[in-house]
Regions:
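Short linear motifs at protein or domain termini
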Residues: 1-50, 56, 60, 175-188
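Hinge/beta->alpha junction and helix N-cap segments in small-molecule ligand-binding domains
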Residues: 131-133
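Short alpha-helical transmembrane interface motifs in multi-pass membrane proteins
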Residues: 36-37, 123-126
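Conserved amphipathic alpha-helical segments that form helical-bundle/coiled-coil interaction surfaces
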Residues: 43-124, 136-145, 154-169
């Protein structure tokens, strides 16, 4: 894993093992995704397995600061003046924000890594049109409301529907056999 060794020079120098962080774990998973050229469909399936549970935990464990981050991302997502890159960044921030609100270090690391891969594979102006933006904004607001209300069941159910619908719509819009994250053809 990256970032686990700290090399110090000098008289008291040497190689020192550092405690792994969420960031180092996310970097390792991200390197695996890029290095193994994991297919976007595999990332989406993993996302469908993890994100509903993140939303459930977020509803149980969220803080006011977590809600403020989700609200900030929701505002950016709903901005009609946002270009594709701004929208995708806000979308990524919201999804990572849900995992952060779960307060589960492993889920946070996985979601950071998955979100970066999904972002790279879905940067497609033909797919992310105004209708997709509106549906995304509505879904995020509904999930955030369930998290705010500490309704874990509703948060998980809404997130499951959201990520599944997004995966289905993406698959319909792109009929290539596979999109490989890390492929120069998909904006790496």
């Amino acid at each position: 894993m990256q970032g686990l060794l700290n090399i110090r020079t000098g008289r008291a120098g040497g190689a020192f093992v550092q405690r792994p962080t969420t960031k180092s774990m996310a970097n390792s998973v991200s390197m695996l995704i890029r290095g193994r050229r994991i297919k976007l469909v595999d990332l989406m399936e993993t996302r469908e397995a993890l994100e509903p549970f993140c939303a459930e935990l977020a509803a149980r464990n969220r803080t006011d600061a977590d809600l403020a981050e989700l609200d900030r991302a929701n505002q950016a997502i709903a901005d009609p003046e946002a270009d594709l890159e701004q929208f995708l960044k806000a979308n990524l921030d919201w999804h990572v924000g849900v995992s952060v609100a779960s307060h589960n270090e492993l889920l946070i690391g996985f979601m950071i890594a998955l979100s970066q891969g999904i972002y790279a594979g879905t940067e497609n102006a033909a797919f992310v049109d105004s209708a997709v933006r509106e549906v995304t904004s509505q879904a995020h607001r509904a999930i955030t409301a369930a998290i705010r209300g500490r309704d874990a069941t509703a948060a998980g159910r809404r997130m499951r529907r959201h990520v599944h619908s997004y995966a289905d719509a993406l698959a319909e819009s792109d009929q290539r056999e596979a999109i490989v994250v890390g492929d120069p053809a998909v904006g790496e």
